[in-house]
């Protein structure tokens, strides 16, 4: 039967069209008695009505997630190259009024900040509104476009966009583990009582103790991101992302990490990208018969244009990977402070009078830990452990020529919020492995204290290496 696009089909012939057919290699579909050429052509594609509805919702919802994710990562990328990010960060304030109203009147939440990338009330409410808006948009789209039988070309561009969103996220989080800056080893964890740890602190410390494990976690996420850059490897990349994000989401839920919204959305996005391959994967895993390959739609009609598009995808993706790598390496390669280490207090006096090591003494120090900076702006972190095992954390600088320690910020435990302070300490070495610190004004007191340096490798957590042969368990 020869038909042309736009031709009207007689009522007696409409039932034989069965939704779609081909004419000289071009796909057509029947819509209300008219023959309409499918967009993009070249790929067979009558979609089930539920598939069309799910795709419409996915375009709206995950498209919004992608925009939010990109806007969240852009300031990080720009800050890494020294670009002011105030105008980008101002965008969140534009959507704050409707989010605050919805949080207060619909969800019963109180928005205290426009923080994104966390489990804040702002982000939970934003996700709720995105679900509602995507549902409404899906309904309107379904009514206005009820005659369409598939979205082959739109699917190709949507998949490209979402692949890059997910790959960008994998590069960001994966590189922070492959170059261990997300969960770095912190010296003061060696002297902090285990019961004082938060669940998040337990997980962070557990991962940081084994750098190979943390690097392996990051490598898996980076591999998933690289695979997502290659169209033919989309299924492999999405599957690996789904596995990675399932583990991350489980840890976030069981250790109460404030990234539940982020990890859950990346997991859902991975499954959305994997959905077109689900039937084939199921058949390959359980039937041993993968079936025919998925026929994809090219982005452009020209083979040359598609080759250029592929090269551009790889260039942009690998370029972003390099930027994240450079940023994390810059943070990781910061110089170790001159006084890096753990120091045990042997004697402490204030106003010239010695203070006995009583657990009730709120002024006396027990230990001082000087560590590398990871989540603060200063080049050195100094932690004071008091007799009751409470901690004061400061950020500051060390002048090794003048033997001066200047503390510039008081750092809140758990949040890393910085409060400006001005405390000056002087130090000197009376003997190898011994140090003396004086201060004319610490908490309103003139103090004098002397220390013995403690080797971090003397702790069981660090002295134990790797052993292939173990005759007895070593579970302390």
Segments (PLM) and residue ranges:
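Alpha-helical transmembrane segments of multi-pass membrane proteins
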Residues: 63-78
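Individual transmembrane alpha-helix segments
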Residues: 105-133, 210-219
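Cytosolic-side transmembrane helix boundary signature
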Residues: 144, 148, 275-312
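Internal/C-terminal transmembrane anchor helices
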Residues: 164, 168, 298-331
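Transmembrane alpha-helix/helix-exit interface in multi-pass inner-membrane proteins
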Residues: 167-191
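Hydrophobic alpha-helical segments
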Residues: 187-287
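Membrane-interface segments at or immediately adjacent to transmembrane helices
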Residues: 313-404
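Edge beta-strand at a domain terminus
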Residues: 333, 438-476
């Amino acid at each position: 039967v020869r038909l042309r696009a736009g031709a009207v089909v007689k009522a007696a012939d409409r039932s034989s069209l069965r939704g779609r057919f081909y004419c000289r290699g071009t796909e057509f579909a029947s819509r209300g008695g008219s023959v309409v050429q499918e967009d993009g052509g070249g790929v067979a594609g009558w979609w089930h009505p539920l598939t069309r509805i799910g795709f419409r919702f996915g375009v709206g919802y995950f498209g919004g997630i992608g925009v939010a994710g990109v806007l969240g990562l852009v300031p990080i990328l720009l800050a890494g190259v020294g670009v002011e990010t105030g105008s980008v960060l101002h965008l969140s304030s534009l959507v704050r009024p409707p989010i605050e109203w919805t949080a207060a009147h619909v969800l019963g939440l109180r928005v205290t900040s426009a923080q994104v990338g966390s489990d804040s009330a702002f982000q939970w409410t934003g996700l709720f509104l995105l679900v509602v808006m995507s549902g409404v948009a899906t309904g309107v789209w379904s009514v206005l476009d009820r005659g369409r039988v598939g979205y082959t070309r739109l699917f190709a561009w949507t998949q490209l966009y979402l692949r890059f969103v997910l790959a960008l996220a994998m590069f960001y989080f994966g590189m922070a583990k492959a170059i261990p800056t997300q969960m770095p080893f912190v010296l003061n964890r060696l002297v902090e009582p285990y019961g004082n740890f938060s669940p998040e602190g337990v997980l962070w410390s557990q991962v940081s103790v084994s750098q190979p494990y943390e690097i392996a976690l990051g490598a898996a996420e980076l591999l998933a991101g690289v695979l997502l850059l290659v169209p033919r490897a989309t299924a492999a990349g999405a599957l690996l992302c789904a596995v990675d994000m399932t583990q991350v989401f489980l840890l976030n839920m069981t250790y109460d990490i404030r990234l539940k919204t982020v990890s859950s959305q990346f997991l859902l996005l991975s499954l959305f990208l994997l959905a077109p391959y689900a039937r084939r994967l199921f058949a390959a895993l359980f039937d041993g018969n993968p079936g025919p390959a998925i026929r994809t739609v090219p982005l452009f009609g020209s083979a040359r244009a598609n080759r250029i598009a592929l090269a551009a995808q790889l260039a942009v993706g690998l370029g972003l990977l390099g930027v994240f790598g450079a940023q994390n390496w810059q943070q990781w390669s910061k110089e170790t402070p001159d006084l890096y280490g753990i120091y045990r207090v042997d004697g402490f006096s204030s106003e010239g009078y010695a203070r006995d090591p009583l657990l009730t003494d709120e002024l006396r120090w027990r230990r001082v830990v000087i560590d590398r900076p990871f989540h603060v702006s200063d080049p050195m972190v100094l932690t004071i452990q008091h007799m009751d095992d409470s901690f004061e954390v400061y950020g500051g600088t060390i002048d090794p020529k003048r033997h001066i320690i200047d503390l510039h910020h008081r750092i809140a435990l758990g949040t890393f919020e910085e409060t400006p302070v001005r405390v000056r300490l002087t130090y000197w070495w009376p003997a190898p492995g011994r140090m003396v610190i004086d201060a004319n004004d610490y908490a309103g007191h003139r103090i004098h204290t002397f220390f013995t340096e403690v080797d971090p490798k003397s702790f069981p957590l660090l002295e134990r290496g790797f052993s292939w042969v173990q005759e007895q368990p070593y579970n302390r």
